[in-house]
Amino acid sequence: DLITKGVKVLIITPQDGAAAAAAAEAAHEAGVKVISYDRLILETEAVDYYVTFDSVAVGEAQAQYLVDKAEGEGNPLYLYAGAASDNNAFLFFEGAWNVLQPKIADGTFVIKNSSEAEAVADKAELTRDEMAGVVGQITTNWDFNTAKGLAEANLTATTAEDKGDVYILAPNDGTARAIADAFAADGDVSSYVVTGQDAEKASVQYIIDGKQSMTVLKDVRTLVGDAITAAITFLEGNTPPETHTYNNGEFDVPAKPSAVVSVDQANVQEAVIDSGYWPAEDFTGLE
């Protein structure tokens, strides 16, 4: 038990944001500072700081890529989300909705796989309950097989007119590859643009090969550095810098989100290889 060993700062990445609250509260009772790392600990005031990437900005970057690639009107749009138990999944979707909703409202995109999203398509801002309805219907649970199964079910339920050149909001790289595989296997899909997140090696290769359109690079070297800096700041008796707050259901948790980068075929060499994030020899087909 780290608390009985006398730690002064605890950095926690919660698998389940609400379930982690008990651990955070035990730490706080012992006078330990708690930093929530990447995912937010929910429903407790026992969180001193949140180190994360700007999850809303991630969703906005994904959606903006789809908007930039779309031409004309009536473009089929398929929406997918992360896990309903993960606060980040809501933030990603919030960011994506910020960008996509005006383009749904003006007819650029037509939602093809979510009656819940269609029902709120005229609303620029969604309540948490409205968003939960949408996320619950399009959740992949961050799982490759769940994502592929859902995509296949969506494609089976739609007609050839709902396909053609399609645009797909996929929440991360694992689900993006699964969904891309499903859409690539459908004879009525003539082309697809699909988003991703995390710059996983397999997805970087997919981008090089033209199987995945983009990913959002969240350089973990930056996040780790920011977490360590925050911990040291607490140990020195000071308070880390705050530019944002994130409400965890109990209060607004202070944070300073780290920057993210959109990556596609045009800048994959510079953003992923030249930056030292992944070595060139791990990939084939680089120019």
Language-model regions: role of each:
Residues D1-E287:
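A residue-level marker of the well-folded mature domains of exported/periplasmic proteins
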